[in-house]
Amino acid sequence: NYLQKRGLKPETMESFGIGYAPPGWDTTLQHFTAKGYTAEDLVNAGLVVEKQEGGGVYDRFRHRILFPIREMNGKMAGFGARRLNPEDEPKFLNSPQTELFDKGRLLYGLDAARKAIRAKDQAIIVEGYMDVVVPHQEGFTNVVSPMGTALTEAQLHLLKRFSKRIILALDADAAGEKATLRGLEVARQTLDRTEELSFDPRGLLRHEARLQADVRVTTLPPGMDPDEVVLRDPQEWQ
């Protein structure tokens, strides 16, 4: 299947809870209502969508690979869903903003990566879900993702709890380059600075703000995503 072709092992899929949303318009609805949940419960959880006309609801995720997104402590927050049919839009569909799911305050994989980030004193930021899962499978467990969006201050503050050494390993395309530049700018604006005294060329005392973090950018081979690099040659990623 798709995930096996992308290099995932069954135990990895199980570890990350990766699943599949069937193509039906009410499969999720029927499954959870049979367990006692109401349509309102499912709307609030972001699993179904209210119809704009005629009333009723329908499944949000259909014929997609589902990546559970968890809070830092492992608690479920929402889903990221990748299309299997290339004609479906959008390519990636996330849970909507809810009380449980605030995308800008979550990092995919942090629940699994936080111990390794602290132990290695280094966090690697990648773009997509597979870019997290494949490195973890191959033993590189300090990798997280902002889920395709630009880094936010809240996400960087999350990482600061575990390490201030951050590597940006975003896709080697135009969009990835822009995301890298945005990430560097957010890091520059967000991470702590200390005021140091120094002398300018005229011998006058001045204050300098020095970033209290080590933020670096790694260059990926052209046309390759992080998961592809890891599968081709783990030593190259290391």
What function would you assign to each model-found segment?
Residues 175-181, 224-229:
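Switch/connector loops and helix/strand junctions flanking conserved nucleotide-binding motifs
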Residues 139-143, 183-188, 230-237:
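Short secondary-structure boundary/capping segments
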Residues 156-159, 185, 189, 217, ...:
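Flexible glycine/proline-rich, aromatic-decorated loop/lid segments
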Residues 22-166, 180, 190:
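Phosphate-handling DNA/RNA-contact segment within nucleic-acid enzymes
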Residues 11-24, 217-218:
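Terminal amphipathic helices with adjacent charged low-complexity linkers/tails
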Residues 1-14:
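Non-catalytic interaction/clamp surfaces of large macromolecular machines
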Residues 148, 160, 169-173, 181-183, ...:
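Toprim catalytic domain recognition across nucleic-acid enzymes
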Residues 194-238:
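C-terminal or mid-to-C-terminal helical accessory/interaction module adjacent to the motor/catalytic core
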